[in-house]
Swiss-Prot record:
Gene Ontology cellular component terms for the protein in this record: large ribosomal subunit
Gene this protein is translated from: rplO
Composition-biased stretches (Gly residues): 23-35
Region (Disordered): 21-41
Lineage, uppermost ranks: Bacteria, Pseudomonadati, Pseudomonadota, Alphaproteobacteria, Rickettsiales
Protein name: Large ribosomal subunit protein uL15
Amino acid sequence: MKLNELYNNIGAKKNKKRIARGIGSGKGKTGGRGIKGQKSRSGVAIKGFEGGQTPMIKRLPKRGFNCISTKKYNIINIYNIEEALADGRLSADDTITKEKLVEAGVVNNKNNKKLVKLLSICSDDFTSPLSLKLDAYSAKAKDLIEKAGGKLL
């Protein structure tokens, strides 16, 4: 047996029905779409319509809401700032602001829409005296920065 001699078994592959190709084809004239109406026209799909049964979107309960006044924070840790200082992306002499963190690549903040909050996870031995001007700080982060001789503006 050779590759060019391979073929399907009889009846294994059925040719698809070509619609709207004349009355003799069995699917001619209206092409299985019925007569007139929205669904007989081209390019129409009624989104969410399930043929008269209650659609899925109505069967499921409404849940939750989006609070308008919720503040969305970009969260960074003290060790992220330490890494940027060690790499030379940030300077310890300058006041560290949200804009400088974005420039250094510590925070991904498009159009400065989100606020920046500083946490102190895994950072118990912070010693750099920094001056920071961010939107929010955790209580532990405040203590660590003030113990190291830093300022929160």
